[in-house]
Amino acid sequence: MTLLLDTHFLIWIVLGSKRLAAFPWIERYRPWGVSPISLLEIQFLAEIGRLSVHNPQFVNELMDDPRFTVDDAPLVTLVRHALRLDWTRDPFDRLLAAHSTARRVPLCTADRRMLAHHPLLPLELRE
């Protein structure tokens, strides 16, 4: 795994969002790393109506999509790293940043708070 996708990047890729046009370099990082935390977040967003998913098997199909590698980092490791990340109160963001840190791979995100605080970003996202 050379890159871990933040949840919104994963959603953009799956839905073929036009927002990806601003990030043509992302293709170089295939297959993209995905945290199980993102899969849980997608399910949560669908359950609360913030993401319209008409296929009940959507998350399961993502796990089998050859474009992605689901990285099964030990949860206890992620929690240990997440405990040190006090710059966000979002548990999903905290665990995704922790996953990136634990695996020492860049986190691909467009989240301003994460861009400002997380030290492991792709060169293309560093200011």
Model-predicted segments: where are they?
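Acidic catalytic patch
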Residues: Q57-D86
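Alpha-helix capping/helix-boundary segments
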Residues: F9-L10, S38, T77, L96, ...
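Short loop/helix-cap segments at secondary-structure boundaries that form the rim of catalytic
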Residues: F23-I26, D64, M114-L120
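Short beta-strand scaffold positions
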Residues: L5, V34, D72-A73, T109
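Short, well-structured N-terminal submotif of metal-dependent ribonuclease cores
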Residues: M1-V34, I48-E61, E124-E127
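Acidic, PIN/NYN-like endoribonuclease modules and their adjacent C-terminal/linker elements
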Residues: A97-E127
